[in-house]
Amino acid sequence: MSTLILVRRQLLRELDAFIREVEACPDDEVLWKVAPGVTNSVGNLGLHVAGNLQHFVGHMIGGSGYVRDREREFNQRSGSRAEVCAALRAARDVVDTTLAGLPEERLNGHLTGVLPDRALPIDAFLVHLGAHLAFHLGQAGYLRRVLTGDNTSQSPLPIIAMLETA
């Protein structure tokens, strides 16, 4: 199985789990709360990963023209679970479409404009984006549990889900 297929499946799996985390918030108010010592709410984390993937996968790799508002991702303090889920679903659609149409050999190419002084290998950058998404998914899950007292996991499916035919 190709690296591209595995990375695509991982990103989609983590985004699906993030949507479940947002939906598991009992109300829209919890979505924007933080615990002491925590800077970002579940809502901010959701908007951030959605914007991050729309920008880097959709725009930088796929040429979508998406214009990112990173400041809004971290400064928004209200909104509905449905709105955050819609942003995550839109990012999921972009990831799915962009990576499904990406030729495998493009993974060996480089991406410019991410860092000011160097080009990044696309395959390595996609792995980084998966780790970044998983990191924030873990933060969102832990924060939701702390704020609600609900210890129910919304985590991604086991690795076998990445190996099965989509």
Task: Label each PLM-derived region with a short phrase.
Residues 8-12, 16, 22, 29-72, ...:
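Short, contiguous alpha-helical
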Residues 1, 35-46, 78-93:
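Short secondary-structure boundary segments
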Residues 1-8:
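N-terminal leader segment of winged-helix/HTH proteins
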Residues 21-22, 95:
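Short amphipathic alpha-helix starts
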Residues 26-28, 70, 103, 107:
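Glycine-rich, flexible loop/turn motifs
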Residues 76-113, 120-134:
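Acidic/histidine-rich alpha-helical segments that form the ligand environment
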